[in-house]
Amino acid sequence: MKYQQLENLESGWKWKYLVKKHREGELITRYIEASAAQAAVDDLLTIENEPVLVHAWIEQHMNPALMNRMKQTIRARRKRHFNAEHQHTRKKSIDLEFVVWQRLAGLAQRRGKTLSETIVQLIEDAEHKEKYASKMSSLKHDLQELLGKE
């Protein structure tokens, strides 16, 4: 496993995930009967800061169909949590118009690179182009100066 699991922290994430799903209207319990499901949800809402009880609630009451999705969500959250500790692994987000994202994604796919690698490559290409243009301008100026002095 690449990232250390922190039971107390992840228990809070799981609790928040389940409460969010419940508020969005998803069935988070394994019970078909509405009163049993509501009783289980009420229990969940009272144990927010009790990692051991949250874990026990998940094993006893959670809808099994939700398990994989929750695991994936927690895994992604764990990765973001640990990556945020170091500046070089911290992720930033930017808003792109759909058409821009589509073109960037197509370019990245053609180059066989990630979106981040493609953006870095485009920036480097632009920097090289600026450097080249500056050099050419300087050479042109020097050449005109040489020709003008004769």
UniProtKB/Swiss-Prot annotation:
Subcellular location: Cytoplasm
InterPro entries: Arc_rbn_hlx_hlx, MatP, MatP_C, MatP_N, MatP_N_sf
Protein name per UniProt: Macrodomain Ter protein
Similarity annotation: Belongs to the MatP family.
Subunit (UniProt): Homodimer.
GO MF: sequence-specific DNA binding
Gene Ontology biological process terms from the UniProt entry: cell division; regulation of DNA-templated transcription
Role, per record: Required for spatial organization of the terminus region of the chromosome (Ter macrodomain) during the cell cycle. Prevents early segregation of duplicated Ter macrodomains during cell division. Binds specifically to matS, which is a 13 bp signature motif repeated within the Ter macrodomain.
UniProt xrefs under Pfam families: MatP (PF06303), MatP_C (PF17414)
Swiss-Prot/TrEMBL keywords: Cell cycle, Cell division, Cytoplasm, DNA-binding
One Gene Ontology cellular component: cytoplasm
Organism of provenance: Klebsiella pneumoniae (strain 342)
